[in-house]
Regions:
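Feature marking well-ordered beta-strand scaffolds used for ligand recognition
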Residues: 1-189
Length: 189
């Protein structure tokens, strides 16, 4: 069992006495009614948002990483659950400190460019990028994810890509946008 550790978005209302734990906690559920922490991948910053962990080896997560604005894509090796490690990372071009933003990755005013979550299948990972649409990554070398393709539908549509679910048997990816504004007032999705 894994659990994300993320500082709440409303952290201005969180007392300073509450510790900022950021990362991935790993638990043994040998005794399901008595989960026991056995490992911890500690990260700096606000921590880990969404996670996908189905193969028993790698967790695919949206995480705050040093030197990268907002969330990036982190692949955590959990094959030794008592000693989890970073296996690979990818970030939206232009979001790493000192990196120039390529023209095709430039956000419009008010847009949020960061990783929301990732769902891998085989040697591909399908990554939701909030207002930057989605990207398909080649993860055949887990330590160096590489962009295969990118599509951004915001604008003209409302954006805030939440989930990108591959349907390999149908050669499709279903992308779902999240409503984050009052009364769903952010344009057609």
């Amino acid at each position: 069992l894994i659990q994300n550790q993320e500082r709440p978005y409303f952290d201005k209302s969180v007392p300073a006495s509450v510790p900022n734990e950021a990362g991935i906690k790993v638990y043994s559920i040998e005794k399901p009614t008595e989960p026991r922490e056995i490992g911890y991948l500690k990260l700096r910053g606000k921590g880990v948002h969404r996670m996908w962990f189905t193969d028993g080896k790698y967790a695919h997560v949206g995480a705050m990483l040093p030197g990268i604005e907002e969330r990036a894509y982190l692949i955590a090796d959990l094959s030794n659950p008592t000693n989890p490690k970073e296996a690979g990372r990818w970030w939206i071009p232009g979001t790493k400190e000192g990196e120039e933003t390529p023209p095709d990755w430039t956000p419009f005013a008010g847009e949020h460019f960061h990783v929301h979550g990732a769902i891998p299948h085989g040697d591909r990972s399908y990554v939701a990028l909030v207002d930057a649409g989605m990207v398909i990554l080649d993860i055949s070398d887990i330590s160096k994810p590489k962009t295969i393709s990118h599509i951004d539908w915001s604008p003209p549509f409302g954006g805030y890509a939440h989930t990108t679910l591959p349907l390999p048997g149908r050669k499709l990816v279903v992308a779902v946008d999240e409503s984050v504004k009052y009364d769903c007032n952010e344009g057609e999705k």
